[in-house]
Amino acid sequence: LDECAKGEVELQLGQSIRKVAHADGRFRVTLDNRIATGAALVIATGGPSIPKMGATGFAYDLARQFGLKVVEPRPALVPLTLGPDEALFRSLSGVATEVVASCGKAHFREAALFTHKGLSGPAILQVSSYWQPGEPIAIDFAPGRPKGWLLDAKKNMPRAMLPAALGTVVPARLAAALAERIDLKVELANLPNQALVDAESRLAAWPFHPNGTQGFEKAEVTAGGINTDGLSSQTMEAKTVPGLYAIGDGVDVTGWLGGYNFQWAWASGRAAGQFV
């Protein structure tokens, strides 16, 4: 704000944009109680993620008004929901464990969290940006475990049941749920080696079939948005509308967790700011 004051920036808070027009090389923005004009206009209103903070799709409407293409927006970095076929796992709400979550060629080793609606946690949020409706995701519940670790468990704890063996890798409630699905209900010593090999393979790529996401309400960012093909990669200026710029989450750029989306917003804003 100090820098804004030095640059004699005028802030208009609590104002709605009623109309934007462009004529004779200048933009005309109609607000609730005034009209602002200028040679440049920066679209910096973000995407529709987290609407309770006031987020809308205004950036896309404005971009389309000026002939810019918009890639269909969708929630990203968002929890996934599970259907009735996987209700057993929805009962694990609150259980978290380290996993490798995969979708196609994307793999993330971080924590996964079971919720009353499905799956969340960093690993799931990351993979959600790559997930498309109808696709499965795979979860490795024993990341880093050496091949044959269940056979080793059979040697080291022969009288144990499968839930106890799985409980050395994941929380007890999750171990019980996984064991129920695998359905090997005898002591490890009485299980054929191949059954344990098969169980280990299943645990390394457990399929889940999300039936959706928790939507823009829970999405940290938005995938899709103003097509980058229509913008200068150096200045963020629209190639077909001199003086019009687009930055931040309203543009079709999506980063991983860890501050990358903030960095994109700041970097793209600075790029545009050099030329406004």
Place the predicted regions along the sequence by residue.
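A conserved short coil-to-beta-strand element within the FAD-binding core of flavoproteins
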Residues: 13-26
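An anion/pyrophosphate-binding glycine-rich loop and adjacent beta-alpha core
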Residues: 68-74, 78-194
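Short hydrophobic core segments
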Residues: 17, 35-55, 63-64, 112-117, ...
